[in-house]
């Protein structure tokens, strides 16, 4: 009897340990892209459409700042197209090579935290499958999976409201609150949002070149699917190799505004991984 109890206990302990290891495996699979706790030496910056007048070389602001909390000092990246009052920087590119490429045919999950420092603004971030010289050449068309934050007016007169946006085959779309069957609310300023985007880098023929987005923050109190089957911008069907962020003051005659966007805790994980890397 005692032996049976001992064997049963051993089995139960093994099962618990197995479950714990499985639970912890998801967080251990995350690869750090950057958490901005050191420097920006591995990042490249390029202002490839600098129309500032009077001309200002390298007008973009891409800096690490410190955020004081009750228990520790956290650092994050602040990105702006230029200082307040400076207009005409149309492409403020900032990018970093991923710790490993996302091969064609594979799915990876990317995680980041974002925080709108201020509106009005015009920001986009996501992934590229181009090398640096080609990123600089193509600008916005260097993106594949893309997320966008802006409240600018479009050329057709439509005014964006500051909700997080994704790329579609016809332009951009606000993320959705599927529970209310409505567009998501505008992002709150000075509020951190957790964003997961699950990137399917299979070919178009294999129903790839698309991504799903999950958000926690603001109106979404828990992690929530907010967009299904958003589309890669160019669908080049190449390995994804860079994290890319871009922002834009707007044209000299009708500037958008230079409000900043904060980034922190960029991670990637093979497969679908909706755990938190933090």
Walk through the language-model features, giving the residues of each:
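Secretory/extracellular carbohydrate-interaction modules
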Residues: 75-167
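Short tryptophan-centered beta-strand motifs in secreted/extracellular beta-sheet-rich domains
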Residues: 191-204, 213
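Flexible glycan-contacting loops in extracellular carbohydrate-active proteins
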Residues: 224-264
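Extracellular glycan-recognition surfaces and repeat-rich motifs
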Residues: 40-84
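Short, aromatic/His-centered strand-loop micro-motif at the edge of beta-sheets
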Residues: 168-194
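Extracellular carbohydrate-recognition regions
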Residues: 24-54, 277-278
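Extracellular beta-strand elements of beta-rich domains used
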Residues: 36, 264-271
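C-terminal motif of bacterial Sec signal peptides marking the signal peptidase cleavage site
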Residues: 15-17
